[in-house]
Design a protein with these regions (language model features):
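Periplasmic/cell-envelope proteins involved in peptidoglycan metabolism and beta-lactam response
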Residues: 1-193, 203, 212, 238, ...
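Beta-lactam-recognizing serine transpeptidase/beta-lactamase-like catalytic domain environment
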Residues: 2-3, 70, 171-217, 222-341
């Protein structure tokens, strides 16, 4: 009898232990998720335009400045004698798509760094005094990677053409210039909203990150790289006689300006951007391998950037036609790339 009671007691103790460990694991899991949320996810949720906490922050903090990497202020808040705040953009349209705007849902850095701009790291005693006196704290500033001179050069070079210019520091990936046209004046975005956001207007569209265009001859870099990958020991022996065009299976590719480049190796074909030679190379390499190479080079993938962007598109297989293969390998066909990519 005593043994049965002892076994029953031992069984109950095991049950209690299992329940205790179960709730302990749940508790530890909640703590782990809380820490993960605070370190990784909190800024994203707080920065969401749908988060009403932002309105609370805005009531207590004067939005911080946005500057270029070389110290030029490109967005700031001006407060008049009555306490009315106005967001000012000293350079107007020049930084429009990069900086964005802070109204109507926000865009650009104003949107991506909204939480930072509305968060204040003023000295805590200063914040206490401000709270008592009803004075707003000064928000944190955002220092961008943009270079003022590079941005100005890109803006002036694009002039009145529709298109985009983006300059990236190759060693770090820092964006030093980003221009998209048509553009808008962020200083008057509220008054101009119906015009810039109306049917037929693309002024709000950031072509630098969201535009998709045929890459043209720049794609020959990938065609040449795939040829080198497939023929690492013999690529220097490549030779092609260009007479301004190439015809295969009834389809013809012409060189720019119908120019004849004569006898070329791979280097000369690349240097002269010879369409005929690269169409010929395209028929030599394996389409499936070229497709794999392009996927490795971030085609068909989202670029890791906080700005709204579109993925570059590439698709080519060994079952595709000769015509499509030739077009694709000179940067035409169905291939689309974003200026960011």
């Amino acid at each position: 009898m005593a043994r049965k009671e002892k076994n029953r007691s031992s069984h109950k103790n095991r049950e209690y232990a299992v329940i205790t460990y179960f709730f302990l694991l749940m508790f530890l899991g909640l703590i782990a998720y809380f820490v993960y949320f605070q370190l990784v996810k909190s800024d994203k949720f707080i920065n969401s335009p749908y988060n009403s906490l932002q309105d609370l922050f805005a009531k207590n903090v004067v939005r911080g400045e946005i500057t270029t990497a070389d110290g030029e202020v490109i967005a700031r808040t001006v407060t008049d004698a009555d306490g009315n705040e106005t967001r000012k953009y000293p350079d107007g349209r020049m930084f429009a798509h990069a900086v964005g705007y802070a109204v109507n849902g926000k865009a650009g850095m104003e949107k991506q760094e909204n939480f930072t701009l509305l968060r204040s790291h003023d000295f805590f005693l200063t914040q206490i005094v401000n709270d008592i006196s009803g004075t707003k704290n000064i928000g944190d500033n955002v220092i961008s990677t943009l270079d003022y001179k590079a941005q100005n050069a890109a803006y002036e070079a694009l002039d009145d053409y529709d298109g985009a210019v983006i300059a990236i520091e190759p060693e770090t990936g820092k964006i030093v210039a980003m221009v998209s046209k048509p553009d808008y004046d962020p200083n008057t975005i509220s008054a101009d909203w119906d015009e810039v956001n109306g049917d037929g207007s693309t002024a709000l569209y950031n072509r630098a990150t969201q535009g998709q265009y045929a890459p043209g001859s720049v794609f020959k870099i990938f065609t040449a790289l795939e040829y080198y990958n497939e023929f690492p020991d013999t690529y220097e022996d490549y030779e092609f006689d260009c007479d301004s065009e190439i015809t295969r299976d009834g389809f013809t590719i012409h060189c720019s300006g119908n120019k004849s480049h004569g006898t070329e190796d791979l280097r000369k074909s690349f240097a002269k951007s010879c369409n005929s030679s690269f169409a010929n190379i395209g028929l030599t390499i394996d389409n499936n391998k070229l497709n794999a190479l392009c996927n490795d080079m971030l085609f068909n993938k989202d670029i890791p950037i906080e700005f709204e962007s579109k993925a570059s598109k590439f698709s080519l297989s060994n079952s595709d036609t000769t015509a499509l293969t030739m077009q694709t390998c000179i940067g035409q066909g169905n291939t689309l790339v974003s200026p960011l990519h």
